[in-house]
Amino acid sequence: MRWLAAALLLALACCSDARTLYRNEATAIALSGGLTPQLFQARGLNVLGFQRLGREHATLTVYIEGDGRAWLNPWQPSTDPTPTDPVGLRLAAADPANPLLYLARPCQYETSNGCDHHLWTNARLSPEVVDLFQQLIDEAMLRTNSVQLGLVGYSGGGALAALLAERRRDVAWLVTVAANLDLAEWVRLEDIEPLSGSIDPADDAAAITRLPQVHFVGEHDRVVPPTVAKAFVQRLPGTNTSRVIVEPGFDHTCCWAAVWPQLLGQIGISR
């Protein structure tokens, strides 16, 4: 038993050291884009954010990070979902919008008593997670005196952004990157277990039929194939303004951040 306890303590220490390293790297990325760190506390969880809040009464742009390192392997959840490469943060740092808020996902970079592996595995898109982000965004809207917001989500953060857009009336536009917007289609293609504790954005896609939205996908993305976003858009009834843009040569992580300002310029969202 002693060796087991020692091994557990060593694993926890290594996890803590890695989390600190990743947090320092994330802070450096954020500072390079003029974003300052802010730790938010809501619903028993600590959520790391970075923000640029110099303008008031403007459209608040909110970025939501991807799922991070949710699994160690197909059978074992990770003990720390912090992303090794925070693509969502890199996108936010490359975006000059002001005001802007970036939000990591629950238990990334920061731990708390409320952290449980279900929050980054089967319940990553649960009603509880959606409500948490609703609260964080509501508070940010008050801080900036904003009356509307735009949502940008990377990977699983794009699915969360879609769920938020379906539930809010102050969203001006939605942009996703490599997002698993149709969970049923995604688990079918990837041959994985359904996310039993999560809400599928595709089930209520009709709620955002008239919302301006652009879904970027990578031609060579094997994590979330382009057909997933296309399946989501097909769930939008009648006439809609949605677009699925397939970027040639891109995959799930490459090369979004490098050309993000140009991609934003091409779609012409109003901010």
Question: Could you describe each region identified by the protein language model?
Answer:
Residues L12-C14:
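C-terminal motif of bacterial Sec signal peptides marking the signal peptidase cleavage site
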Residues R23-G54:
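N-terminal cap/lid segment of alpha/beta-hydrolase-fold proteins
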Residues V152-G157, A161:
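Gly/Ala-rich beta-loop-alpha elbow adjacent to hydrolase catalytic centers
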Residues A179-N180, A184-T241, I245-D251:
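The feature captures the conserved acid-bearing segment of alpha/beta-hydrolase catalytic domains
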Residues C115-R143:
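Alpha/beta-hydrolase active-site loop
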